[in-house]
């Protein structure tokens, strides 16, 4: 038992299965209790009840699974993950499991490399294969009875793994090295500094001609232009004047003023019912005799209608 590294006062879990003999289990537990002492504790449980037990996280210092002589326990990924969960940070797991030594693709029995990969995926580190040994006649018979599997290429492998010194999801502060700013200024090449430096004395050199921006404009350029002169030659030609799209010459504003002036000269209804028809119009309504129209629709009256009104 010295290879398991069990110390006095530690909490140890021993997992077995139905293939483990009671005498061998009692003998193993007695030896472990002798190592843990009165301050420690040894917990024994069937591996098939591990997931249902719902142990608290970080409960055990050492876990022994399948170590009972004659045991042929097979560890599922879920069982390995739960063992890693209930191990304390820095705790160790020791297990023994039958493995295939050939490259036969088998869903029941893993190879030694797949067993180590499963331990790594469960969250353990420092996975090591301690030893391999042939199955005893009792173990071979147990494989045949409980698992219905028989093969001449089976071996029993002992593997160990360690839980990292931190819990999953824990956080710690990183000590970042901040680079101190140097008080010594970098050396600058004088030739390079002179190349990229423009002196004020160079600006006052008589050989440099500066352009006066005021001399670029003539007196005619400073006069405000007449809006009529900005119109295009073909803008508004024809019987019906029409402003161009995005007009900038002022024709659009001019047409808008003329339209608003024409609308203001039209007579306005005092009752507001003129558009409904003659049945709703007054006796002196200028729209008498005209059909009904939509509210807001522009209706032009002839001079005779205006005179009658």
UniProtKB/Swiss-Prot annotation:
Stretches for region N-terminal SAM-like domain: 6-172
SUPFAM superfamilies registered for this protein in UniProt: S-adenosyl-L-methionine-dependent methyltransferases
Position of sequence motif Cx2C motif 2: 282-285
Essential cofactor(s): [2Fe-2S] cluster; [4Fe-4S] cluster
Subcellular localization(s) per the UniProt record: Cytoplasm; Nucleus; Mitochondrion intermembrane space
Binding locations of [2Fe-2S] cluster: 235, 244, 247, 249
Residue interval(s) of motif Cx2C motif 1: 271-274
GO molecular function, one term: iron ion binding
GO biological process, alphabetically ordered: apoptotic process; hemopoiesis; iron-sulfur cluster assembly; negative regulation of apoptotic process
Parts forming coiled coils: none
Keyword Transferase in annotation: no
Region (Fe-S binding site B): 271-285
Gene3D superfamilies linked: Vaccinia Virus protein VP39
Residues with the Phosphoserine modification: 182-183, 213, 269, 302, 304
Entry-linked InterPro entries: Anamorsin (IPR007785), Anamorsin_N_metazoan (IPR049011), CIAPIN1 (IPR046408), SAM-dependent_MTases_sf (IPR029063)
Subunit structure: Monomer. Interacts with NDOR1. Interacts with CHCHD4.
Entries under HAMAP family matching the protein: Anamorsin (MF_03115)
Membership in a protein family: Belongs to the anamorsin family.
Comment, domains: The twin Cx2C motifs are involved in the recognition by the mitochondrial CHCHD4/MIA40-GFER/ERV1 disulfide relay system. The formation of 2 disulfide bonds in the Cx2C motifs through dithiol/disulfide exchange reactions effectively traps the protein in the mitochondrial intermembrane space.
Protein name per Swiss-Prot or TrEMBL: Anamorsin
Gene behind the chain: Ciapin1
């Amino acid at each position: 038992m010295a290879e398991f590294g069990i110390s006095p006062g530690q909490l140890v879990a021993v997992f077995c299965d139905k293939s483990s003999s009671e005498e061998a289990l009692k003998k193993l537990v007695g030896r472990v209790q002798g190592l843990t002492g009165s301050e420690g504790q040894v917990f024994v449980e069937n591996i098939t009840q591990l997931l249902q037990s719902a142990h608290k996280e970080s409960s055990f210092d050492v876990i022994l699974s399948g170590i009972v002589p004659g045991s042929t326990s097979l560890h599922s990924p879920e069982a390995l993950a739960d063992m890693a969960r209930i191990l304390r940070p820095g705790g160790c797991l020791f297990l023994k499991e039958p493995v295939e030594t050939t490259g036969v693709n088998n869903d029941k029995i893993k190879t030694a490399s797949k067993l180590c990969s499963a331990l790594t995926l469960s969250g353990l580190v420092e996975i090591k294969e301690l030893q391999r040994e042939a199955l005893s006649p009792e173990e071979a018979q147990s494989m045949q009875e409980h698992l219905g599997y028989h093969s001449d290429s089976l071996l029993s492998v002992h593997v160990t793994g360690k839980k990292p010194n931190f819990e999953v999801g824990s956080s710690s502060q990183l000590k970042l090295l901040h680079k101190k700013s140097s008080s010594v200024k970098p050396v600058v090449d004088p030739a390079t500094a002179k190349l990229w430096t423009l002196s004020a004395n160079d600006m006052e050199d008589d050989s440099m001609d500066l352009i006066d921006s005021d001399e670029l404009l003539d007196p005619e350029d400073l006069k405000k232009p007449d809006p009529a002169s900005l119109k295009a030659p073909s803008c508004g030609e024809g019987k019906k004047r029409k402003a161009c799209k995005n007009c900038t010459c002022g024709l659009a504003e001019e047409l808008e003023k003329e339209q608003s002036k024409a609308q203001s000269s039209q007579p306005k209804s005092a009752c507001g019912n003129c558009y409904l028809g003659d049945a709703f119009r007054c006796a002196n309504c200028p729209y008498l005799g005209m059909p009904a129209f939509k509210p807001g629709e522009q209706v032009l009256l002839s001079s005779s209608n205006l005179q009658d009104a």
